[in-house]
């Protein structure tokens, strides 16, 4: 085992604080509408330019092991906030730095670190309660756009497109962000359920120009296994022909004789029909077929449940207003499923999302929720160069996460003002002893840090701005860094999601509390380079040979 280097007390804390400051100073220049960019070097390709706090934090590794520990702990703050709220990573980093800095001063002055931490935790809980109480629900699409605009660093076009996408697919719908090949940023919306399986034969096409099969007011047969013969289905097909409605067959596969029979019937004009493979594989395929069944009000014909094709009746089929099938994908619009059943299914999948530990499974489950609940929107981000596209995509991702958070827990005044106003609840709060009260005061000072930093980045004195906001009796009074005006932040349209502000403070105080209570640090000793191998030693004369 390699030898370890151990540092104690003040020496350990100072090293750690240095690492915290290096990382936080690099991240905090991005905060606010007038925050600057950070350029990240890449081992290949062009450097990346970003204003995303967590992207900057993730790039930082320090040479000194002890300083690096401090930096990594603050990186954890940014990552946790990003995972929980999707935005607010820079705010969380600035808060963590402020709490650690003030806390270290108090520890150096001889206060008990554990009591300081208890005071910090108590104050954080009170401020979080105040933030929740001050939160108000998002009422309309204009407010959603404002949240998106603020998070995208004042680019109103991004806010507008996100609001538009959310309006179309609903709050439960999935919105994905991709890179566009062109200059423009566009939004595509797919309503209804879409899955990536196309028609099994081009003969099913109804619109030869577009090469798509369109079925209006359509019946849907969902079958779990392969169909190789249509013989068991003949009674059902006769009923479908009499009803004069089109039929879509979704099965594991339709092959050989069965497919040929369907194509011949379609070409003769007796049956409006199409067939596609079921989406997904294995257990996920079963679950997705069940989703389609609930969405369309039908049943999955499954041998596990003792159902046979011979006994299928018309009332076991699902129905949908419109189905369109291309060679690659199928879209079911306006299924006839019961709303209550769809909601119950969504709730069931949500429970699975909370319980799963796999990111891949979570993503697939979220897609299923979106397909059941509303639809899917894709925002394609454009730009002149690859570097610009990547930078904009970072901002669109942040803005999208912020708007989702706003819809979940409502909004509060932006620009760091919500924290300062919520901090007023700490004015008369006292801990069980003097050290706990000192911990409460650490939080009271630290929660002004984001407001100060936003002002500093706009070229204004942060202390003056913080003083004015603190002394104001109006809860929504603040400083608009974009226009450098004081006034009602709601009227300026400067609003933040309550969830983002809350999460940033909780994560920052949690990790900062751990840093303050650190008394010793252990790291691997740097390896000394071994000296270069010399030549072979002198072997002396070999003596005379006989």
UniProtKB/Swiss-Prot annotation:
Q: Which GO terms describe its cellular component?
A: cytoplasm
- Reactions catalysed according to its record: ATP + H2O + a folded polypeptide = ADP + phosphate + an unfolded polypeptide
Give the protein's recorded name: Chaperonin GroEL
Q: Print the organism lineage.
A: Bacteria, Pseudomonadati, Pseudomonadota, Alphaproteobacteria, Rhodobacterales
- Say what the protein does: Together with its co-chaperonin GroES, plays an essential role in assisting protein folding. The GroEL-GroES system forms a nano-cage that allows encapsulation of the non-native substrate proteins and provides a physical environment optimized to promote and accelerate protein folding.
Listed EC numbers: 5.6.1.7
Subunit structure, interactors included:
Forms a cylinder of 14 subunits composed of two heptameric rings stacked back-to-back. Interacts with the co-chaperonin GroES.
Keywords (A to Z) from UniProt: ATP-binding, Chaperone, Cytoplasm, Isomerase, Nucleotide-binding
Spell out the residue ranges making up region: Disordered. 526-546
* Pfam families found in the cross-reference section: Cpn60_TCP1
Coiled coil residues, start to end: none
Q: A Gene Ontology biological process annotation?
A: protein refolding
> What family does the Swiss-Prot or TrEMBL record give for this protein?
Belongs to the chaperonin (HSP60) family.
For the ligand (ATP), the binding residues are 30-33, 51, 87-91, 415, 496
Keyword Metal-binding in record:
no
Compositionally biased, Gly residues: which spans? 532-546
Organism this protein belongs to: Ruegeria pomeroyi (strain ATCC 700808 / DSM 15171 / DSS-3)
**Location in or out of the cell:** Cytoplasm
Q: From the Swiss-Prot or TrEMBL record, what is one GO molecular function term?
A: ATP-dependent protein folding chaperone
The keyword Ribosomal protein is assigned to this record: no
PANTHER family found in the cross-reference section? 60 KDA HEAT SHOCK PROTEIN, MITOCHONDRIAL (PTHR45633)
